[in-house]
């Protein structure tokens, strides 16, 4: 199948089975994952270890749970090739040699609507500075690298569904809400510049709403917030009129796509949407959570002005066009949203105490 790359060039690709690692080299890889103790990173670590790869994680635990690496170790005890280095990317990577690794996944970032709105300096500096450090690290040995980006890069959304080559429009710089989108767009520009100028095999993934076990709601993530409220019999707070619509994809489906993208030379220099394309409104999502968990919770509408700063801007619809990633790797998510809700509820029950301790401590160390 033929698709257009990020620079307009055609890319020849073939449909691939999403249940296996379609890497060019099936031998064990030495993998570095920044942000590997976080939500997506811990699931990716677990997947790669299960496939026999060596995994080194760099994470400062600012938003990741300390139990995540322990969970990975428990599952991957038969694969004693797992190392966790605590610290920021800018601190740790200068102490490591690129010669130690075969691939790099850069997942570390400032994430979550509330964190972005409340800490814009942290958001901008973390996203841009750390991505620059990681790209220089990978470029020193021309390591294949996957850069985690976001659907937020589409800004106000010129059209729906959103395609990787769409133009983007952001709000005024006086609203910090857009600093996350702009910082991740800069990350993309930088990664693509490394690819064009030095041949760095970099691939960019724009994650849409990714959900599932190990996700926390303290920084604005909607599904774990709804699930926790429903389990406690509390009101589910829906911001605005609730008609804003999103597409939710299970993290276990998402991480299966990442090794295939980084392992396919035809994907280098490309930008790929990653998620589901089935739309659900936030109000309908709240109702689905209540029904799935058999909760007696009510749904309460909350104006954006009460949830965030005045002038907060949100998109009516965020839906990915998945044509490119389907053509490149045959991506087809299989876990239904109802199953994700049930699994998240079960996992939230297990770790409720740790989340409370992290929030009380302010999240970051």
Q: What does each of the following model-derived ranges do?
A:
Residues 4-8, 20-24, 44, 50, ...:
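C-terminal substrate-binding subdomain of Rossmann-fold SDR/epimerase-dehydratase oxidoreductases
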Residues 113-116, 212-213, 307-311:
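A short acidic, helix-capping loop that chelates divalent metal ions and anchors anionic groups
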Residues 2-210, 344-348:
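N-terminal Rossmann-like NAD(P)+-binding domain of SDR-like oxidoreductases, especially those catalyzing
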Residues 127, 183, 219-220, 318:
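Short, conserved glycine- and acidic-residue-centered signature motifs
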Residues 60, 67-70, 97, 157-160, ...:
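Short aromatic-enriched loop/helix-cap "lid" or pocket-rim segments at secondary-structure transitions
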Residues 186, 190, 194, 226, ...:
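Hydrophobic alpha-helix immediately C-terminal to the catalytic Tyr-X-X-X-Lys motif of short-chain
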Residues 66-70, 188, 224, 283, ...:
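Short, surface-exposed alpha-helical segments at coil->helix boundaries
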Residues 85, 158, 175, 215-219, ...:
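Residue-level signature of the cytosolic catalytic core of signaling kinases
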């Amino acid at each position: 199948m033929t698709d257009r790359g990020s620079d307009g060039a055609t890319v020849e690709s073939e449909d691939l089975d999403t249940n296996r690692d379609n890497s060019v080299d099936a031998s064990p890889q030495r993998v570095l994952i920044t942000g590997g103790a976080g939500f997506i990173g811990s699931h990716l670590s677990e997947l790669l270890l299960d496939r026999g790869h060596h995994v080194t994680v760099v994470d400062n635990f600012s938003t990741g749970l300390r139990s995540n690496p322990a969970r990975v170790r428990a599952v991957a005890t038969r694969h004693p090739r797992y190392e966790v280095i605590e610290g920021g990317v800018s601190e740790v990577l200068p102490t490591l040699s690129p010669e130690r690794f075969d691939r790099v996944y850069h997942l570390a970032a400032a994430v979550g609507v509330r964190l972005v709105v409340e800490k814009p300096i942290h958001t901008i500096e973390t996203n841009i500075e750390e991505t620059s450090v990681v790209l220089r690290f990978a470029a020193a040995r021309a390591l294949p690298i996957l850069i985690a980006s976001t659907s937020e890069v589409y800004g106000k959304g010129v059209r729906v569904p959103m395609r990787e080559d769409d133009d983007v429009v952001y709000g005024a710089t006086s609203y910090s809400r857009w600093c996350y989108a702009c910082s991740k767009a800069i990350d993309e520009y930088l990664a693509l510049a490394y690819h064009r100028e030095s041949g760095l095999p970099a691939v960019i993934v724009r994650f849409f709403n990714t959900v599932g076990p190990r996700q926390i709601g303290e920084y604005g993530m909607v599904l774990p917030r709804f699930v926790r409220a429903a389990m406690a019999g509390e009101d589910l707070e829906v911001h605005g009129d609730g008609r804003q619509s999103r597409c939710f994809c299970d993290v276990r489906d998402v991480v299966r796509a990442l090794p295939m993208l980084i392992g396919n030379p035809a994907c280098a220099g490309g930008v790929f949407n990653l998620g589901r394309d089935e739309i659900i409104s936030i109000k309908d999502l709240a109702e689905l959570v209540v029904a799935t968990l058999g909760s007696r919770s009510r749904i309460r509408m909350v104006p954006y002005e009460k949830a965030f700063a005045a002038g907060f801007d949100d998109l009516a619809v965020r839906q990915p066009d998945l044509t490119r990633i389907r053509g490149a790797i045959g991506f087809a998510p299989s876990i239904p949203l109802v199953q994700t809700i049930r699994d998240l509820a079960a996992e939230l029950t297990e770790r409720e105490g740790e989340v409370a301790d992290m929030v009380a401590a302010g999240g970051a160390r």
